[in-house]
From Swiss-Prot:
Binding site for S-adenosyl-L-methionine: L73, G105, M124, S125, K126, M127, T128, F129
Top EC group: transferase
Annotated keywords: Cytoplasm, Methyltransferase, rRNA processing, S-adenosyl-L-methionine, Transferase
Protein encoded by which gene: rlmH
Stated role: Specifically methylates the pseudouridine at position 1915 (m3Psi1915) in 23S rRNA.
Family per similarity comment: Belongs to the RNA methyltransferase RlmH family.
NCBIfam families, per database record: PRK00103.2-4 (NF000990)
Pfam families, A to Z: SPOUT_MTase
GO molecular-function terms, A-Z: rRNA (pseudouridine-N3-)-methyltransferase activity
The name this protein goes by in its record: Ribosomal RNA large subunit methyltransferase H
Subunit structure: Homodimer.
């Protein structure tokens, strides 16, 4: 199984880029993991919120492949503790044959078409985070889940 984090828009602040890349590299010791970046839309000032979600949704759908298991990181998704997320990842590793794709949408969330193709939604918190920060938090949680599953010393309960 390959695990992909699909995100809309690039990370611009160097300290986030460095930390995200560090956790991606650490995670690759355990699983095949990468982050794909969908370029952000240009000239969005002329678009309504719904129009921007639709255009970003089209780009997200284009990046998906047949057989992908699609999990949206969404404020209305299921919340999990780190141990629960590790168990979730273990179940996915045992059942997903192709790609497990976690998706972080644009600033206004997902289009209805993206919601329709999604298999699941999970929430990182009831709080709101910047799109840059949630990428870092999520890749850290993927790494944490892998260390839990492999008996590493990283996580303390």
């Amino acid at each position: 199984m390959k695990t992909t984090l699909l995100v809309v828009g690039r990370t611009v602040e160097q300290h986030y880029i460095t930390a995200i890349n560090d956790y991606i590299q650490r995670t690759k010791r355990f699983i095949t993991f990468d982050m794909e970046v969908i370029p952000e839309l240009k000239n969005t000032k002329s678009l309504s919120m719904d129009q921007q979600k639709e255009k970003e949704g089209e780009l997200i759908l284009k990046a998906l492949q047949p057989g992908d298991v699609i999990v949206l990181l969404d404020e209305h998704g299921k919340e999990m503790r780190s141990l629960e997320f590790a168990d979730y990842m273990k179940r996915k590793m045992n059942t997903v044959n192709k790609r497990l794709v976690f998706v972080i949408g644009g600033p206004y969330g997902f289009s209805e078409k993206v919601y329709q193709v999604a298999n699941e939604k999970i929430s990182m918190s009831k709080m709101t985070f910047s799109h840059q920060m949630i990428r870092l938090i999520f890749v850290e949680q993927i790494y944490r889940a892998m260390t839990i599953l492999n008996g590493g010393p990283y996580h303390h309960e």
